[in-house]
Every structure is written in structure tokens, then in C-alpha cells.
């Protein structure tokens, strides 16, 4: 009877029309939010940034603020005053984490999530490279995270089963954002990489690298082992990228002990990559230091502590050098972009010319994403045994942060009165 009637299509079209009509009621609310973001130079993040890039309408704004407590109160007041007798009468400001995360609801709908810019130490904020996009609603140039940071956010969620319901949408965002990102780097450079001097010590460097991947607590995400995975060889590229599930300082002691017992001369440094979307991230860097000469030091390993606070999906590969755990393609892409972000930050802060090495990683990233895709199971492992690391319940993390900040002084920054002590 209904074989010639597109019932589902008609229902979808009717529902979409109703939803759009309902959303149009809040046009003044959305415009006020965007004007506030523009005036206070806030930085849009998350899905809001993806939609901004793609020139689509935004109905939930997520953004960073350099004065999140005051800005949240000011914006909530503005929204309430729009129509206090009707639409915006029930404007609610919710404190998720004091001085760090606030939510604004209007008419029982969530419209705003405000975050403090993560701090490096004390109250020094992590630097965020400026990037502008034109809004589809107000046509203003708004600050937002750059495409490399947005892709890192997307890949992080594509590796996390907690976001499985969002994966189809995220895959669409990933494809669009990747194209926009690569458009910034139109030139492809052929870079040999490495130094001839490194070849003299290749056997020693290889010994260190193979020790790094011999334990099941570490995951390969790029560098040396990659030449066994794809149809290209990275010439003299001995550098290895790893993720560890151990504490980064515990790893430092383990590695130093191994190298000392084998007479291998290395230097180890731990630093903060200053990733605003992932402030917990730390990087341990190992340099092979021949003859204790800093001019003869070669960077051979970058190790990230991601597995100490989240689960990482893995695949197992077999090579001539042995069997290793390697991150899924989305994990590898994520950490190639972390390297690119760090190099862009160095170039911006020190004025050093990092174009060639950035292009090297861009080429790696492009080859990775253009390689034949493995099976769905290799992209999205369904077995819990294929995930390595430590799971931290996000709700427990919020409660821990709330407890930690419970006794925060009422004034910012809080300092005791020396005369009254």
C-alpha cells in the first residue's frame, strides 16, 4: 500500500523543518553569544570550531577564555536581559569546576561551555597560535583553534570508545578538516632526514630503540618502525615515537638504568608540548650522546605519557626486528600532528625556520592517511585486550578537580595578606 510513498524521507524532512523552526527562536541568543566571543577575543574549540571552519551553524558554543569566571557571569547576565519575561527568563549559570569550567543554559537548553585556558605553571597560560574563521551567523572573524589542534581533538575521540556514537560525524569532520589542513602546505619537499654521522652509530642507536619497544607497556606511534609498515622508506630516520602506560618519570629511571648498565651514553629530557587541548601530555626525549659532546647528540626517541591517563587502541605487527604493539592509524596521525604543533610553536616563539622539518612530518602524515586503510577491526578494535593504558573515569576526574579547588581563595589570584599573618 505504501510501497510508492517515501514515508521515511517525508518524516525526516518534516522533522528537520520543525527543528530548524524551533532553533530560529533562539537567534538573538546565538547572536549575543557570538558578539561576546568576538568582543572578548575568546577562542572557539571542540565541535563548535569544526562547524565554524565548515561555515555551518553552531547551536552549542565551546570556547576558551582568559578570565573564565568573570566572562561566564557577564555572558549569563547579557543572555538573561535579552528577554527576561519570556525566552531567557530561565538563564542558568552552572559551575562545573570553579575557575576552570562553566556551563550556561537558556530555557533549559545548553548553549555555552566556557573553559579556562590551561596553565603551564602557576597562572601562566598555554600559548595558542591565533587562527581566524568567518562566522556563518554574524560574519565576524572569530578566534578558534587551528586545524592541526582540531584534528588532534578529532583523532583523540576516534580512539576513545566513550565517543562511539559520535564516530560517524567525527569521520566526516576529519575528512573536511584534513583537506583544509593540507591546503596550508601545498608544496611537497623531498627530505632525506638524519645525518651521515648517525650512520656510524646506527647499531648502537638501533639497540636502544629495540629495547624501547621490547616491553608491552609501550606502543609505537611513528618513526623508525614505520618503514616496515608502508611502501616507503624514511632514509636515515632513526627517531622513534612511543606511548607509555607508565608514569613518565618512572620511565626515565628505567631507561637510564638500562643505558648505564650497557655503557650507552644518553641524555634524557622531559618537557611539556604545551598542547591546549591536552594539558596532561608530557614528552620524554632521549638523545644519543657520543663522547659526551653536545654537538654530536642525536635525538632518537620521543616518548609520550598518554597511556598513563587514557586507553590507547593498538595493533600488533611482526617485522624482521621482532613483534611490536603499534597504535592504530588514528593514533599515529594524532602524534604526527603533535610533532607538527610543537614545531609550529617553536617557529612562532623563537623565529626559527622549521619549515623543512614541518614539511617532513606533513609528508609522513599525508602518506599515512593516503595508504590503503586496514580492516575496520584494525581501525576500531572491539576487544578490550587491544587497548593499552589506564582508564580514568571523566566524572571522577571532575569530582577530583572540584575537591582539589574547594578551598580556593575567593579572590584571583589569591595571596595572603602579609600584614595580617
Curated annotation (Swiss-Prot):
Induction conditions: Expressed in the late phase of the viral replicative cycle.
Recorded family membership: Belongs to the asfivirus K421R family.
Chief subcellular location: virion
Annotated compartments: Virion
The entry's keywords: Late protein, Virion
A cellular component term, taken from the record's GO annotations: virion component
Superkingdom of origin: Viruses
UniProt name for this protein: Uncharacterized protein K421R
Organism taxonomic ancestry: Viruses, Varidnaviria, Bamfordvirae, Nucleocytoviricota, Pokkesviricetes
